[in-house]
Amino acid sequence: MSQIDAVARKALEKAGLEKRFTHGLGHSFGLEIHESVRLGKGQERPLEAGMVVTVEPGVYIPGFGGVRIEDDVLVTDSGNQVLTSLAKQWDEVLGA
């Protein structure tokens, strides 16, 4: 889990936003919207096929606001399947 978090942090660092990422990366969900598996620093529980997790990096700017764009991802035997299909590019989001 911490490897996934590291990839997200590296992307935010490249964009100059690493200090604005102050929340966990995501969590598992199923019967409950927030279940026990967390994606974040220091989380080492392995993902298993059949798990569904959120990947929702958030960027927050004090006094201004913030944004989280969430993907729901099914963990499969061969990798993953992104279950959401929402726009992520600014021009797509603003035009939606």
Describe the residue ranges of each PLM region.
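Active-site neighborhoods and metal-handling regions in enzymes and metal-associated proteins
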Residues: 1-96
